[in-house]
Amino acid sequence: MVYQSEYALENEVLQQLENLGYERVNIHNVEQLHDNFRTIINERHKEKLNGKPLTDREFERLMTGINGKSVFDSAMQLRDSYVLKRDDDTDLYLNFMNLKQWCQNKFQVTNQISVKDKYKSRYDVTILINGLPLVQIELKRSGVAITEAFNQIERYRRQNYTGLFRYIQLFVVSNKMETRYYANSDREIFKGQMFYWSNEQNERINYLKDFIEDFLESCHISKMISRYMVVNETDKFLMALRPYQVYAVEAILNRALETNNNGYIWHTTGSGKTLTSFKASQLLSQEENIKKVIFLVDRKDLDNQTLAEFNKFQEDSVDFTDNTRKLLKQLADPTLPLIVTTIQKMANAVKSNHSVMESYKQDKVIFIIDECHRTQFGDMHRLIKQHFENAQYFGFTGTPRFEENKSQDGRATADIFDKCLHHYLIKDAIRDHNVLGFSVEYNQTFNSHEDLDEEYISKINTSEIWMADERIEAVCRHLISNYHKKTDNGNYTSMFAVQSIPMAIKYYDTFQRLKNEGVHDLNVATIFTYQANEDAQEDENHVHSREVLDRIMNDYNQTFKTNYNTDNFEGYFSDVSKRMKEVVRDDKIDILIVVNMFLTGFDSKKLNTLYVDKNLKHHDLIQAYSRTNRVEKERKPYGNIVCYRDLKKQTDEAIEIFSQTDNTDTVLSLSYEEYLDNFKDILQDVFQLAPTPLDVDKLEAEDLKKEFVISFRDLSNTLIKLKTFDEFQFTEDELGIAEQTYEDYKGKYLNIYEEVMRGKKVDGEEGVSVLDDIDFQVELMRNDLINVKYIMDLIGQINLSDAKARDEKRHQIHKLLDKADDQQLRLKADLIRSFLDKVVPSLKEDSDINEAYYEFEDKEKTKEIDAFAEQKAFSAMLLNEAVNEYEYSGNIDRKSIGQNISEPFMKRKRKTDQIIQFIEDTVEKYGVVE
């Protein structure tokens, strides 16, 4: 029935595409795909071929030249011409797609193309443009999660997508009621890279029929591939624009080409404004009647970030101007259609009265302004506008200025940029999973709070009540006690926004004193300086002391083995920024104290918590909160905001302004109580399927196992959210399940996962199990604190001279092994148990326990290799050599293994697969622990 249901859906899709003008073709294998491609190449290049279609040898040369490339190189080739040497030694210039006149391509659709490479697979629906498979659609019946279609495509990408299938640009996955699209890649693709399509009003187009009508309409899909994908030349991967990015770029292009008016794009922080602005700049710079596109940024710390991003999208597409003289030189160069510079340098260039500037007075110049809500642009806009008489200005902002939050000169964003051309609000981005929501908690930090007038509280920024030693220490202790809950045991990092530089120094010194007293072992850093881009009006209490900053930098140098001081502040800034982005355990900043720096324009997926002891409102509040809400893995459900001031009113007001709604629930997470109720409801589903962990083993039917996996996965997802709250306690009274019972269920869940993984590796056939494409989200189960290194450290601590202490430590390690979720530790668990029970009790007091363990491990490894070799009638010596080679180089010589098996083909192939699997598992199990 499942097959029939999906088959019927497949036919609906084919019929609809046919109605939209696609030619339905019967292509069901690679040979037919090649024949069709050859026919279309001949058709599209009829004039160039002069009545002489490609010969077999010519087509073979063409296929040799364009086949076997990576996804990235195939994407580059698709967008370039190809020079084919004909049999008569003349050159033939071929192109594979009309990138400018999108409708003038040939559109075909087929289904059930069967590919047999390492494994046999059949693809649901394939869209061919000019004979190349550019869009692959994978369908699931209603009620099945589309992540299963995603996982199936991932399997195909690993096993079968070779040859012309490397030209696939976009994947579409759907279960009829929910549909998403995403770009192909040579890399691992994450589920967060699947996008919803929507209309201009940001209303999702989920229903497959509507999606096909809008997104897969032939001219649109061709335009999407031609115009709204970016081939990232630095990191070598494809990017597809999201719908709101497409609409924003189109709105800017229409405004620039059809009017002389300005406009701004309001896209929430974290939604990819840099990519949108790059694509708009790139397309505008290709227009003949536009003399120059100038991208203006505000601060030096953003210059390098924007430049790096732009040059990632297209290598060497921009050359940043680091001084006004260089800017003038670039303005004079007609071969540079796109320039990135600062507002300040452009203002200086205008003031210079240079002859180059005169030549631009009457020309059509486009200015694109990043973070256009900032006040500096308003100040310099008049000067620039007076000079460039025919310029147009397009601004990008996540937090525009309105009447409620207008700038100091009394102007709103619309006063400068006229009209909002497209908006994508924070509530839209959260709904689409493009950014995370916020979990906000408020902590009272002085007893007399309720007795103070609210207006008075807002005015006492640096008075004694906020800077009191007792209050500062209480906040530090509260933060320390909850740090691991908030940051997922240190897998993420945090920022602490405070009111002033004196407060930052006081907090820093308090954290350091508490660290010296043994209260915590967190790495705390701070960064501040007026010269490094703190706005003067936001820094009235500026008391910067170079000596204090040098002292703080010296602590930093001691911690991270660096060598910074105030003379090379930029190096310090870069290092801090890098450690906040590339979180490496034991080499990261746990808490970064800031005043204004890093609260705008700084992106880090590894930052998940913001502590706040600072008065924030309107755009400043949303900008600061948004540092935490970049999407990462499943273990980051939202951005944590911990306020040590009562910012409830300001938070609600800011959300209402920037979401254009009075419903803050669209942005804020549920309460602890609501998550707890959800947890208990899901727990009942788990109990119904398997009343005890042992009952999981009785679930023989795969459909029941699948139900258990989905229910327990949802339970774990909710548990991660609960664990971030201060009030969380893992007790049976609180949650309805004891922690050990939960761990036992988790063990059963991971057993099912490992069974499926083993089955996939050995069998590798499509549709072997309904569990094959389930999204297990094993990331949810991870506890980084209990891994092989941690257990080996505990083994090293066993006291062999005290039998009681020795057995207590053995018992402790046994308990930890029972709740192991680290993959390598689960592989080693039985080995370690055996060592603890059989070897440790017999060790002498002066034995080196670590040496004893590795000696035991080597013997067990040899036993396993010999036993497996005997079982498979394979040479133990050859198997041992293969294991050692794989351990050393990561390579397995499949051919050599096969040559040493005297069996018929199918048996030899299966045995080879089993031996390779054993080699991989053995190296993973006995591998060296870093």
Curated annotation (Swiss-Prot):
SMART domains referenced in this protein's UniProt entry, alphabetically: DEXDc
InterPro entries: Helicase_ATP-bd (IPR014001), HsdR_RecA-like_helicase_dom_2 (IPR055180), P-loop_NTPase (IPR027417), Restrct_endonuc_type1_HsdR_N (IPR007409), Restrct_endonuc_typeI_HsdR (IPR004473), SWI2_SNF2 (IPR040980), Type-I_R_enzyme_R_subunit (IPR051268), TypeI_RM_Rsu_C (IPR022625)
Enzyme Commission code(s) on record: 3.1.21.3
Function: The restriction (R) subunit of a type I restriction enzyme that may recognize 5'-GAGN(7)TAC-3' and cleaves a random distance away. Subunit R is required for both nuclease and ATPase activities, but not for modification. After locating a non-methylated recognition site, the enzyme complex serves as a molecular motor that translocates DNA in an ATP-dependent manner until a collision occurs that triggers cleavage.
UniProt entry tagged with the keyword Zinc-finger: no
Quaternary structure (record): The type I restriction/modification system is composed of three polypeptides R, M and S.
Extra facts: Type I restriction and modification enzymes are complex, multifunctional systems which require ATP, S-adenosyl methionine and magnesium as cofactors and, in addition to their endonucleolytic and methylase activities, are potent DNA-dependent ATPases.
Annotated gene: hsdR
Protein name, entry field: Type I restriction enzyme SepRPIP endonuclease subunit
Enzymatic class: hydrolase
GO MF assignments: ATP binding; DNA binding; type I site-specific deoxyribonuclease activity
UniProt-annotated binding residues for ATP: T268, T269, G270, S271, G272, K273, T274
Catalytic activity: Endonucleolytic cleavage of DNA to give random double-stranded fragments with terminal 5'-phosphates, ATP is simultaneously hydrolyzed
Residues passing through the membrane, by range: none
Protein family (similarity comment): Belongs to the HsdR family.
Any GO BP: DNA restriction-modification system
SUPFAM superfamilies linked to this entry: P-loop containing nucleoside triphosphate hydrolases (SSF52540)
Organism: Staphylococcus epidermidis (strain ATCC 35984 / DSM 28319 / BCRC 17069 / CCUG 31568 / BM 3577 / RP62A)
A family per Pfam: SWI2_SNF2
Keywords annotated in UniProt: ATP-binding, DNA-binding, Endonuclease, Hydrolase, Nuclease, Nucleotide-binding, Restriction system
Domain named Helicase ATP-binding: residues: 254-418
